[in-house]
Every structure is written in structure tokens, then in C-alpha cells.
Amino acid sequence: MTQQVDRVSTSKPLWARYSWIGWVIVVGIAVAFPFVVDRPRFWLPNIGVRSLWLGIIAMSLVFLNRYVGLLSLAQATIAGISAYGVGYAMVTMGLGFFVAVATGIVAGTVAGFLVALIAARTKAIYFLMITLALGQVFYSYASQAIEVTNARRGLAPIKKPDLGFVNLNDITTFYFFVLALAVLCYLLCRYVAATSFGLALQGIRDSPERMAALGYRVNRYRIGAITFAAFIASIGGVVLVLDRAQVDPDVVSLGSTLDILVVAVIGGIGSLGGVFLGALVLTFLDNFAQDFTDRYQSLTGVVFIIVLLFAPAGIAGIGKQVKRVIDRRRKELSFFSVGDPQQEPPAAQSAEEAITKGKQQ
């Protein structure tokens, strides 16, 4: 007697194997964006560039949440510290562009390291509240420190340079410069997540006690992850200050912190690439909702609630959510198409017949 064995494929499902095609299309649209809009001087700075630096900063938040299990509300503050570093170096000290950029990135990364030293031993709501409190402490400092931040007036003007081989004052060139940075930040996050360091972070996220028992120093890994996320946020802060041409306490305010959180949730709190979709939604609402209502911030809140209710995984997770629904329906249909569940299988019937015959003998 031969038995037919069904082979179960252990490979990734079709949608997962070809999901990269969707992101290639998104990047293609981003590249074509400056050439298809009718008013580039409006669309590129207000929608394109702003969406990109918002996405870069939000990506640092998503990295911590996805691979470490920590939700940080200090990422906007870290980006703001980086922006202040660039502004202070260029406006107050009169340093060159590259030195100022390096100063900003170092300042933001060091700030993230200090946040990590304070908050790495906590988790969940305690980590969130500590990072929020630290952000508000710096906001108060930036609003009052006239010698360093120029208080409410901020630091200005911060001019984009003409580097010879690339002129960042040209809006199209600056857009492609920021787009390249966004792609590099995304690839860097994916690379770090795939290294032994990233795999250890995921193990710490799932079971810190077990990883500690295996000899991993959990706090050190968390400090490293928070510092790396601060480095990514600092790059976003550099782009922010070059785009705005000034830096003031508004960039580290509670409103800016909530903007980054909204971008991450709408795009997908577990998707590194989805943050750019969330940033696009937020910038569209900021620029166009004001034409229809004077309560455009309320409209942003409504969109935020709708996403939480109907797409908890964000815009980037809608495809997976639809796939799960389809798979569940297929299983339900296959269950009802098997046959009469009350009918006993032949193997069971033959076993009962054998027992009956044995008793008769």
C-alpha cells in the first residue's frame, strides 16, 4: 500500500518574495517626482524634501521599536540637537559646511548616547516617559539659552552651500541629495539589523532574561542600539536645518515629537520604509487640509485614529493584512468543503470492525 504525502513548502509566500518590487516602484516614483509636478518650487520643498527628512527621523524611532522593542519619544529632540549643532557651528562659530555637518551629527549622536545611559535600564512605558521628559528638558533649555541657542529667535541664516560638483541651492539637486541620504539610511538600518548585533537585539527584544543568561550584556546592546538610532536621527536633523535655513525651539517642541510619532504609526510602526508613506500623508494634510478647514490638526487626529482602528500595522502593512484575511477565508472554505464531519474515516471504521471480529472469535 502506498501513501500519498503532501509536500509543504517552507519557502516564503509569493507576496513576500516579490514585495521588493513595490518598493522599487515607490523609489521610481520618488525619482520621477520632480519631473511630473507642475510647480516644482512648491512640491519639492513642501512635500518632497520635508517628507524625506521626517521619514529619516521617524525611521530611527521604528528601528528601536522593531528590533529592540523600545518606543522612544526623544528622536525629534535628538534631530533638533543635531540641527542646533549645525546652526551653532555655521552661524556662531563661522565654520565651514562639512565641519558644521560633522558637528551636528556628533552632537546628536552623543545626545542619544547620554539618553541611552539614563534610559537603557528601563522599558515599556517607563522608557517612553523618560525619553519624553528628557526631550522637554532640552526644549526648555533651548527656549532660554540665549548664548547658545539664541532662545526663541533661534539661529539663522543657515545657507546651503555650492560645493562645485553639486549645488544644493538648486531645489531639484537638493531633493535628490536628500533622497539619496534617505535610501542610504534605510539600507544602513537593514544592514545593521541583519548583522550579529542586530540579531542579538532581536533576541533581547523577545527575551532579555534568556539573552542575559546566555552571556549577552543586555544594557550595552540597548545603549548601542539607541546610539545608532540617534545617529540616524541626527542625519535627519542635518537635512531639517538645511531645508528650513534656521533652527529654533519649535524643532524640539512636543508638537515635533508628536509629528514623528504620527508619521511612524501611519506609515507602519514596524516598517522601516513605511515611514516615508506616513510622512507623505502628514505633509499632504499640513499643506492642503488648511485650505478646507481651520481645524486641520483635528483632521490629522481623525486620520491617525482611523489608521489605528482599521490598519494597525500602518499603510505599509495593509498588504499583509489583506493577505491574512484571504488566507483565513481560504481555510474556512477548505474546512467546509472537506465533507460531512460526522462521517467517520475509513481507518476508524476498519478498526472498529477488527475489534468486533476479535470479540466474536
Where are these regions (language model features)?
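Transmembrane alpha-helices and adjacent helix-loop boundaries
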Residues: 2-361
